[in-house]
């Protein structure tokens, strides 16, 4: 029904009277009676009603002629899509002749069920059209409303209205909805077809049903193909209908003209998509955006719901061509801004990188060359977005001469309290396993931070010394000793192998039977085979008797003193007891490339280790509570040794030398610095080993300013160790000699706080030993000195006189 008729059914219009002079005047019962007379009896009856009701002549001659031509008999069956689209004229009788013509025109046969004539049908006779190609989501707020007005012909240098419309079509990405009374412009229609076929944009078109035939003629001129129909929907609609009491009706035309794009823009006005409207007619359009676009959204959905489909099957179309390959241009990375470039090269990112940028680029390029087919090796044009080569961003000009910040100063490190002069250890970084809820100190690893400046200088001096030495001997001859038995310092690697080679780790297990079978107290260093014997003085001629401190952290060779009484009286250059041995047989778990010097089978050059090994600090627990103390022997007689420099970005996780802030070690309580220096230089007096048997610890007297029980001295990383003359027969099953080790080693007491290095014995003692601290002492046993003594005295590995020795060392 017409809108005026719908308003009459509203409760607000009951007894509502309005005159023609008021703005709200819309519906008039007198005008309705005049239209009823026009439709039923013609124009003369129309003018008679106007005179009788004394109302204005509200229809023009053009409108009278259009209404008379548009009158049709209201027949519910004619609206069925299965019936021919021929519209019956008012002059037709609508009887049997009309039904026969309908059947002849291809209508439904008599046996087929006709549309229902029920007033409230259970099911609709027609399906509701759906926006099957997609529609933008409903947005609560679309933004601020903005409007731009364009005229035809353009004024003030504005683009013409056709250009504005075509640009909006080319910029569409989601949906284009067009409502037009007359659509015959081929250029705009081709733009819509390309948007739907090439860019997959949904295109909906609604045209006036009286102008559908002109639209179909345009489709024939556009040379469409079948691919254009995939994302195109065309429907037709008309104006509102006016129903009369004589079972007739007439309908208006679709005069709305707007285009709705992507749910956020719309263009409307008097412009129709025709050539004449863009060239000769004067029109105006408005381009709108913002919240006002919501009205166009709702209006199009309502029109689409009441519209009828337009079939394009009768239009001759070509086959769908193959889609053209989309060649994307190679995107050159833009130079980042100065602020962003500084963020990208921030040194703090080096702490979380697993590899350096050069290694990542090299590995990725090698992988691409391997996976690429042989025919495509070398530079090739990328045809797909995934084939684009990843180029490293260029260095920003602002970063060329920019000094990098040292972010290690901001790390949560624990610097050693009062470090010794010349120590290269700056601090430690905790590494805690996130899977452990409450980590203990023995479950933490640490990264030792060292100063590599001195190591670089030592490396340069070694290069200069290597270039100046003409002798290619594998090892230098034994250096002469001075009067005190101290070997002069000598920096550098052995001359035989100037290029460091990657060491090959080998098992350290040695058959015990072969060790027990050997007899003799004069057996010294066994490097290659058990059959080879060393000289009587206990020095291997292939190795130097002593080594300088610079050689120790790089070569990891163990020094040896002559097995004579005088040698025991000499001061140990590195502050080691004879019982203590260095850490050269430990391998850092996180860095497989760092191996110690004794991991190989021979005395040749090994690759220097850049990782810190397990600490050799140990203590003797007495009855009175003695706090844990850290012993330092990094300061050696010949100067501090430094490991070679390594990249900060390389993965390197090692285990530190003390338990961290949880264990709270105190620094040098009960022993002054002068006492430590004196104990490193002063030698140990020999003891009668044959009378008391072989023991695991050397109990000697040291000259100390502080009275108290004797203490064990630690062995630091990369230091030398002296030999001890012992008989394998006297040691019994506790004596073993690893392959490649320069001296026979003694199995430590299970009760000793020092961690054992024999993997086989470690497996046997795992059931009885608790989790040890980084010093090797269980935290639960630190205060139980009696129990610890009992274990040390009554252990199955302890000799028979161990208890007597423990009693000898009690405080008086």
Curated annotation (Swiss-Prot):
Biased composition (Basic and acidic residues): 79-90, 761-772
GO CC entries: cytosol; nucleus
Residue numbers bearing the N-acetylalanine modification: 2
Sorted UniProt keywords: Acetylation, Cytoplasm, Nucleus, Phosphoprotein
Biased composition (Pro residues): 471-480
One BP term from GO: BMP signaling pathway
Compositionally biased intervals (Low complexity): 589-598, 721-731
Residues with Phosphoserine modification: 4, 124, 127, 356, 609, 613, 615, 649
Subcellular location: Cytoplasm, Cytosol; Nucleus
PTM annotation: BMP signaling induces the phosphorylation by BMPR1A at Ser-609, Ser-613 and Ser-615. Phosphorylation at Ser-609 is necessary for the activation of SMAD4-independent BMP target genes such as NEDD9 and ASNS.
Binding partners and assembly: Interacts with SMAD1 (via MH2 domain); in a SMAD4-independent manner. Directly interacts (via DUF1669) with casein kinase isoforms CSNK1A1 and CSNK1A1L.
Name this polypeptide is given: Protein FAM83G
């Amino acid at each position: 029904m017409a809108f005026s008729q719908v308003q009459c059914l509203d409760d607000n219009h009951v007894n509502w009277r309005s005159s023609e002079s008021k703005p709200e005047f819309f519906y008039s019962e007198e005008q309705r009676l005049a239209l009823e007379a026009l439709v039923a009896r013609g124009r003369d009856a129309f003018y008679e009603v106007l005179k009788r009701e004394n109302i204005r002549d509200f229809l023009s001659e053009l409108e009278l002629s259009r209404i008379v031509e548009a009158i049709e008999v209201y027949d519910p069956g004619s609206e069925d899509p299965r019936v021919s689209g021929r519209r019956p004229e008012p002059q037709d009788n609508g009887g049997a002749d009309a039904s026969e013509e309908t059947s002849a025109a291809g209508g439904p046969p008599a046996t087929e069920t006709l549309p229902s004539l029920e007033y409230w049908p259970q099911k609709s006779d027609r399906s509701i059209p759906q926006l099957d190609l997609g529609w933008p989501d409903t947005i609560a707020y679309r933004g601020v409303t903005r409007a731009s007005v364009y005229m035809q012909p353009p004024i003030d240098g504005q683009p013409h209205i056709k250009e504005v419309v075509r640009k909006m079509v080319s910029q569409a990405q989601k949906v284009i909805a067009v409502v037009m009374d007359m659509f015959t412009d081929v250029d705009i229609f081709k733009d819509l077809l390309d948007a739907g076929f090439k860019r997959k944009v949904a295109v909906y078109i609604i045209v006036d049903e009286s102008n559908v035939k002109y639209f179909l003629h345009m489709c024939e001129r556009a040379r469409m193909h079948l691919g254009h129909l995939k994302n195109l929907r065309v429907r037709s609609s008309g104006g509102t209908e006016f129903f009369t009491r004589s079972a007739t009706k007439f309908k208006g035309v679709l005069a709305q003209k707007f285009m709705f794009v992507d749910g956020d823009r719309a263009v409307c006005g008097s412009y129709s998509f025709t050539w004449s409207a863009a060239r000769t007619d004067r029109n105006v359009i408005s381009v709108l955006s913002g919240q006002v676009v919501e009205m166009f959204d709702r209006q199009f959905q309502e029109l689409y719901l009441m519209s009828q489909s337009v079939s394009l099957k009768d239009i001759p179309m070509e086959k769908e061509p193959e889609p053209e390959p989309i060649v994307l241009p190679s995107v050159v990375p833009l130079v980042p801004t100065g602020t962003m470039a500084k963020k990208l090269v921030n040194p703090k990112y080096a702490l979380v990188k697993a590899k350096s940028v050069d290694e990542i680029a090299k590995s990725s390029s090698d992988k691409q060359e391997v996976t690429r087919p042989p025919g495509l090796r070398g530079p090739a044009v990328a045809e797909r977005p995934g084939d684009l080569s990843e180029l490293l961003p260029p260095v920003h000009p602002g970063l060329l001469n920019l000094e990098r910040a040292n972010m290690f100063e901001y790390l949560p490190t624990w610097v050693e309290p009062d470090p010794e002069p010349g120590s290269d250890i700056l601090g430690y970084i905790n590494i805690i396993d996130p899977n452990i809820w409450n980590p203990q100190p023995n479950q933490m690893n640490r990264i030792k931070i060292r100063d590599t400046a001195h190591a670089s200088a030592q490396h340069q001096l070694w290069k200069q010394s290597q270039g100046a030495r003409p002798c290619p001997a594998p090892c230098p001859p034994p250096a002469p000793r001075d009067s005190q038995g101290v070997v002069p310092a000598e920096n550098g690697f052995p001359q035989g192998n100037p290029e460091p080679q990657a060491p090959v780790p080998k098992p350290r297990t040695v058959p015990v039977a072969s060790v027990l079978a050997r007899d003799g107290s004069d057996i010294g260093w066994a490097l290659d085979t058990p059959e080879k014997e060393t000289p009587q003085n206990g020095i291997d001629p292939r190795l130097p008797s002593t080594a300088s401190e610079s050689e120790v952290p790089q070569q990891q060779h163990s020094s040896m003193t002559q097995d004579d009484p005088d040698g025991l009286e000499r001061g140990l250059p590195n502050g080691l007891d004879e019982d203590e041995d260095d850490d050269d047989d430990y391998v850092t778990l996180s860095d497989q490339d760092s191996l110690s010097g004794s991991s190989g089978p021979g005395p040749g050059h090994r690759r220097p280790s850049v990782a810190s090994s397990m600490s050799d600090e140990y203590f003797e627990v007495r009855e009175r509570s003695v706090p844990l103390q850290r012993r330092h022997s990094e300061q050696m007689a010949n100067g501090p040794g430094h490991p070679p420099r390594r990249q900060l970005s390389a993965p390197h996780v090692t285990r530190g030398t003390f338990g961290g802030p949880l264990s709270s070690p105190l620094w040098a309580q009960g022993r002054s610095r002068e006492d430590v220096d004196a104990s490193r230089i002063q030698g140990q007096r020999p003891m009668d080993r044959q009378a008391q048997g072989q023991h695991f610890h050397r109990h000697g007297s040291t000259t100390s300013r502080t009275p108290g029980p004797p203490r064990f001295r630690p062995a630091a990383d990369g230091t030398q160790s002296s030999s001890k003359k012992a008989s394998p027969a006297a040691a019994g099953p506790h004596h073993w000699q690893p392959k490649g080790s320069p001296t026979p080693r003694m199995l430590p007491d299970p009760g000793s706080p020092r961690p054992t290095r024999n993997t086989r014995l470690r497996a046997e003692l795992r059931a009885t030993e608790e989790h040890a601290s980084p010093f090797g002492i269980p935290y639960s046993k630190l205060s139980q000195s009696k129990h610890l003594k009992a274990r040390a005295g009554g252990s199955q590995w302890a000799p028979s006189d161990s208890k007597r020795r423990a009693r000898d060392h009690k405080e008086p």
